[in-house]
């Protein structure tokens, strides 16, 4: 798998980050992976650029499930993220759910690509589930508010649990769920960010095995 052609499209309502995903070991067409962020903070907008971390985190499980030998990303993701993904794959394998070997992550040298210059700050995924809420509580207990690791932003994602089927976007359900989380986020001092992705529309394992 190759992840390349990072881009940004701005509109009055949202900022869309995109990348082209090319399959190497599966007979699947190139696909565009997007993350659409609404109500982005001004300090983030000023330094906006595609982040290799986000695309690697999204594409690594896809590459692993579909039997890609590698995932080559035209960027320089965080080494800690790479180590964490390898660790996660080891867990998946120990649980008996991985039919293929772990894909190797290949990155571009730092000299060949820019390093994000924006402010560093903690961010989390929040769906309202117990695990996410526990993680947020533990983070706020462990770090001081002045620490960059202190979580101040939380992503609520359309296209993951809600709206993961293209034929049924569930926009009203997503809106209600988002609004129900806003008081909780405000109480925790976290800014809740609406994000949409099309990752769930990528090839499903059943189709990939049939094509393979």
Model-derived features with residue positions:
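Conserved Rossmann-like nucleotide-cofactor binding loop
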Residues: 131
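Hydrophobic positions on the alpha1 helix immediately C-terminal to the Walker A/P-loop
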Residues: 135
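Conserved adenosine/adenylate-binding substructure
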Residues: 191-212
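Glycine-rich Rossmann-fold phosphate-binding loop(s) that bind the pyrophosphate
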Residues: 128
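RNA-binding accessory domains that recognize and position tRNA/RNA substrates
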Residues: 1-122, 138-196
């Amino acid at each position: 798998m190759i992840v390349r052609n990072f881009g940004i499209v701005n509109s009055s309502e949202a900022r869309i980050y995109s990348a082209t995903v090319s399959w190497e070991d599966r007979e699947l067409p190139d696909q565009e992976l997007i993350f659409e962020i609404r109500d982005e903070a001004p300090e983030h907008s000023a330094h906006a650029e595609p982040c290799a971390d986000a695309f690697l985190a999204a594409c690594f499980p896809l590459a692993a499930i579909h039997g890609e030998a590698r995932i080559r990303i035209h960027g320089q993701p965080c080494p800690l993220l790479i180590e964490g993904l390898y660790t996660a794959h080891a867990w998946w394998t120990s649980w008996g759910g991985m039919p293929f070997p772990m894909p190797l992550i290949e990155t571009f040298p730092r000299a060949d690509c820019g390093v994000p210059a924006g402010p560093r700050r903690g961010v989390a995924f929040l769906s309202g589930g117990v695990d996410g809420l526990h993680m947020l509580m533990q983070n706020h207990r462990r770090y001081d508010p002045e620490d960059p690791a202190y979580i101040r932003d939380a992503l609520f994602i359309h296209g993951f649990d809600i709206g993961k089927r293209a034929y049924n976007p569930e926009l009203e359900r997503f809106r209600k769920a988002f609004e129900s989380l806003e008081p909780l986020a405000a109480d925790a001092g976290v800014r809740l960010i609406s994000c949409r992705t099309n990752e769930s529309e990528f090839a499903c394992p059943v189709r990939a095995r049939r094509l393979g």
